[in-house]
């Protein structure tokens, strides 16, 4: 025979895998728009950072960080398209929807870290306020505002759209909602615009641009440079307050928690499942949020022994699928068994007491050397060995024969009871002795309890 050579598949590097997945995404024309906006965002961010350096404005730098956040949101939208194209694999049986959650969580946390950096730099500037040049401050403000709004309203970002609606409202949204109610009380026609929950990203873009416009006017009129630092702190606080609820919501999804508003509906579904035909018990239920708008869960269902497993499984899955997109149901039948009762008459000899009781002394030999018949391996003792179980005189003692002193009829004597074999392999076998005035119909007397045969009753001669 010739030599057999094993050919292994060449493992691609990380860069090669990323290139392959990027080609998969770019095959869809819907992703071209995202890539175009991403390229424009990089160019726009470069210009804004240059203007931040020339104007020496911390407020414009804080506002530019929102443009960088837009780039993260575009990457998240691109990941969302990739997740839609990928199918579940044996390693990731639930799919790749959690990557969307991870992208949203990372983007919001990075935005909060940028806000903290702005707060730290602004605190240092309060001690020594530099001069602010307003040459390109207003131009940079409107360029950033236009691009941020155009990106948010043109690109359909499914993950961030869901998070902005599902997460709790930020303090900025609550204050704007209060002002909108007051304004709509004066002008009712604006209720259709201001009363609904405003998009938090659009709101922070408008609020940041408004703060920069106030900064520009105060510096141009009074050369009040400290207002730039105050505006930077205001934009950083608004950024942190807007991103914090989204990061909390996406973090809870990553921790596989159950949303509070779904717990009542899940309890109702489980009660309905427990009332299905053949279902005895529903236990070990666990439900969690798999992605944005999708839930997964597992449940164990105990059914009757005569129930149809496939039928019960279909009914349970149908009930749970109304709320849980990926349910996992494990069916197992009831293992309770009734004790087997003996039918028929009981033999009369079962109640007879033998002449002697043979009591086997318990063996004090360690059970470590004994084999378990189920596993064919030495079984471990269930408890610690006795304290004085080693080298004791009664370790290999033979059985003890205890006489049974039963009451006999008057006038019947006790004959001697010779033994054919005194001790035979640890069992005493008594013989039949001669009795005075006693005639029996047995040729062999049984030596174990419960082995007597009918006709062994003694007869007495008058």
UniProtKB/Swiss-Prot annotation:
Extracellular membrane side: 55-64, 120-134, 222-223
Pfam families: Cation_efflux (PF01545)
GO cellular component, one term: trans-Golgi network membrane
Localization, UniProt: Golgi apparatus, trans-Golgi network membrane
Cytoplasmic side: 1-33, 86-98, 156-200, 245-462
Membrane as UniProt keyword: yes
Transmembrane segments: 34-54, 65-85, 99-119, 135-155, 201-221, 224-244
Organism: Xenopus laevis (African clawed frog)
Topological category with respect to the lipid bilayer: Multi-pass membrane protein
Function according to Swiss-Prot or TrEMBL: Has probably no intrinsic transporter activity but together with SLC30A5 forms a functional zinc ion:proton antiporter heterodimer, mediating zinc entry into the lumen of organelles along the secretory pathway. As part of that zinc ion:proton antiporter, contributes to zinc ion homeostasis within the early secretory pathway and regulates the activation and folding of enzymes like alkaline phosphatases and enzymes involved in phosphatidylinositol glycan anchor biosynthesis.
A single GO BP: zinc ion import into Golgi lumen
Subunit and interaction comment: Heterodimer with SLC30A5; form a functional zinc ion transmembrane transporter.
Top-level taxon of the source organism: Eukaryota
Chief place of localization: Golgi
GO molecular function: monoatomic cation transmembrane transporter activity
Cytoplasm among keywords: no
Keywords, ordered alphabetically: Golgi apparatus, Ion transport, Membrane, Transmembrane, Transmembrane helix, Transport, Zinc, Zinc transport
Name of the protein in its database record: Zinc transporter 6-B
Family as reported in the entry's similarity comment: Belongs to the cation diffusion facilitator (CDF) transporter (TC 2.A.4) family. SLC30A subfamily.
